[in-house]
Amino acid sequence: MAGHIIHVHTTIPAPPDQVWDVITDVAHAGDVLRSVSDSELLTEGTYDVGTTWRERRTLFGHHGPEQLQVVESEPPRRTVVEAEVGHDVIRTAYRLTPSGPDATGTRLAMTTTVEMSHRSALSRAMWSMFGGFSYDRTRKVLEHDLEDIEAEACRRATTP
């Protein structure tokens, strides 16, 4: 059973490769995203399926550390990351599409889903009644993530 599904998107005045570099620089997420207070890379090598890291953030009412893992990666167009939080699985898909007359910009779309199939019937009922309170807050966090990704991609574009 899916809980919330949140779609957010923006257009960034930087090419997909630069935006991809920001999204996949998970070791520095705490320096880029205001919703992340700490990030620690747990695997070695380049960003790809299996890359794992731990970060501290607030999402869907959960405050604290969570371990994330890349489950899909199609550089520089699409990636999906997943985290288990309690009995839930939170999955975020990033889709990067070239935009603008010369494809110098990027349309970045994020879809975040919380999968609650492992919750008890009572827990799912409680979510149905009270889960909406976290929806608006989480949507705002994701919109801030988009703003922060845009700011960092633009900053990197102007840094020699």
For the regions a protein language model found, what residue spans apply to each?
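Beta-strand elements of well-folded, non-transmembrane domains
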Residues: I12-A14, G61, V114-H118
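Hydrophobic pocket/interface hotspot
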Residues: V19-I23, A29, W53, V70, ...
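Hydrophobic ligand-binding cavity/cleft-lining segments
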Residues: M1-E44, D48
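A short, structured loop/turn motif at beta-sheet edges
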Residues: P16-D17, E44-Y47, V71-P76, R95-R107, ...
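Beta-strand/loop substructures that line and gate deep hydrophobic ligand-binding cavities in soluble
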Residues: E84-H144, I149-A151, P160
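Generic C-terminal helix-cap and adjacent flexible tail
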Residues: A2, P16-D17, A151-P160
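Short beta-strand segments that buttress and anchor functional surface loops
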Residues: T51-T58, T79-V85
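Short, surface-exposed coil-to-beta transition loops
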Residues: I5-H7, H63-Q67, D88-A93
